């Protein structure tokens, strides 16, 4: 299927502009939080900046989807109850949305505008779908990587379209991600990346803060590498130890054949679905997210967009048994953990996971 003939052109345009607008808002908010923290006026327990960012991002994107595809459902992370109980937060959020709509006024004809709090509440609550294996719905994570967002580090705005339980389109805005990631310390190139994938078409990279929605033909096609030798491989993992079992992941790398003297340099720690973007663009080879406990179930919005990005760039994604992730199970995945790798080593990675988890 070519760049210009795929059946999701309108969906991709709407998703791209909505994610760009939400990414710009969350980037500005994250930067201001970091500055406030440096001045000592932000307390550790103050969750309001994240709350505002989450709600504003979800409102912008949900509004754009419902404006263009009124029959589509949305599985979103937030509902508006907390916001309606705190009019101060709601006022701050509406000010941010109004500001960003003016700064991206060229997008208004396609993604629309929000003008009052009730409209914002309604848009947020469009995200109440339970998902499922039939029909068409979107999965949204308005700010993926909360800790990274607060640190001024990596976070992402993630949107995916799911049809009959299968992801067919994904868009991930990465406001703080450099184009080139060599190690935890070495980042270079343009900061701010937009990663998109369409089923049967491919995965693509473009500059996040470049105005408008570039057609795929003008974007950079990205592909995973086919490295197989452990000395060549790089692994992406989360930063927060509460989200995945780093100790188990260390054992898996050893079992796979990583050299203990170099494995630390071969591991890149990143918050959010930017890990999928680094993998899909060929800058890493394995993504490990082992469950911290056996009862935890991943949310679909944490993986849907990244899932199609990996497949369309030539990789493979599964749970700890290697089975494909099931996005038709409702709001959560019915499996444990997430593993992604290039197709040449995926089965070997799963073998190592199985050995360690015995």
Curated annotation (Swiss-Prot):
Keywords: Amino-acid biosynthesis, Hydrolase, Magnesium, Metal-binding, Nucleotide-binding. It catalyses: 3'-phosphoadenylyl sulfate + H2O = adenosine 5'-phosphosulfate + phosphate; adenosine 3',5'-bisphosphate + H2O = AMP + phosphate; adenosine 2',5'-bisphosphate + H2O = AMP + phosphate. Gene3D superfamilies: 3.40.190.80, Fructose-1,6-Bisphosphatase, subunit A, domain 1 (3.30.540.10). One of its GO terms (molecular function) is 3'(2'),5'-bisphosphate nucleotidase activity. Mg(2+) 2 binds at residues 141, 144, 302. NCBIfam families: bisphos_HAL2. Phosphatase that converts adenosine 3'-phosphate 5'-phosphosulfate (PAPS) to adenosine 5'-phosphosulfate (APS) and 3'(2')-phosphoadenosine 5'-phosphate (PAP) to AMP. Regulates the flux of sulfur in the sulfur-activation pathway by converting PAPS to APS. Involved in salt tolerance. This is 3'(2'),5'-bisphosphate nucleotidase 2. It comes from Candida albicans (strain SC5314 / ATCC MYA-2876) (Yeast).
């Amino acid at each position: 299927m070519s760049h210009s003939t795929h059946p999701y052109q309108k969906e991709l345009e709407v998703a791209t502009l909505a994610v760009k607008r939400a990414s710009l808002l969350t980037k500005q908010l994250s930067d201001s939080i970091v500055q406030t923290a440096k001045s000592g006026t932000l307390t550790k327990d103050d969750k309001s900046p994240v709350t505002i960012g989450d709600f504003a991002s979800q409102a912008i994107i949900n509004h754009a989807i419902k404006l263009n595809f009124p029959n589509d459902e949305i599985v979103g992370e937030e509902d508006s109850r907390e916001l309606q109980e705190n009019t101060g937060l709601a006022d701050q959020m509406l000010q941010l949305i109004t500001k960003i709509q003016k700064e991206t006024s060229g997008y208004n004809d396609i993604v629309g505008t929000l003008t009052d709090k009730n409209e914002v509440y309604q848009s947020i609550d469009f995200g109440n779908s339970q998902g499922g294996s039939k029909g068409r719905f979107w999965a949204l994570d308005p700010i993926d990587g909360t800790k990274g967002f607060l640190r001024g580090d990596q976070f992402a705005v993630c949107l995916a379209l799911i049809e009959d339980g299968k992801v067919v389109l994904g868009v991930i805005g990465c406001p703080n991600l450099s184009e080139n990631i060599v190690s935890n310390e070495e980042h270079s190139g343009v900061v701010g990346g937009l990663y998109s994938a369409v089923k049967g078409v491919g995965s693509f990279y473009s500059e996040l803060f470049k105005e408008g929605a570039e057609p795929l033909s003008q974007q950079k096609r990205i592909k995973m590498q086919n490295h197989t030798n452990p000395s060549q491989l790089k692994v992406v993992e989360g930063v927060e130890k509460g989200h995945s079992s780093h100790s188990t992941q260390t054992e898996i790398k050893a079992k796979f054949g990583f050299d203990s003297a170099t494995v630390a340099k071969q591991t890149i720690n990143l918050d959010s679905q930017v890990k999928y973007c680094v993998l899909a663009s060929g800058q890493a080879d394995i993504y490990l997210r082992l469950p911290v406990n056996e009862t935890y179930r991943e949310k679909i919005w944490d993986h849907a967009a990244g899932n199609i990005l990996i497949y369309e760039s030539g990789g493979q994604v599964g749970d700890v048994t290697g089975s494909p992730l099931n996005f038709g199970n409702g709001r959560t995945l019915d499996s444990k953990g997430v593993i992604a790798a290039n197709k040449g080593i995926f089965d070997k990675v799963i073998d190592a996971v199985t050995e360690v988890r015995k």
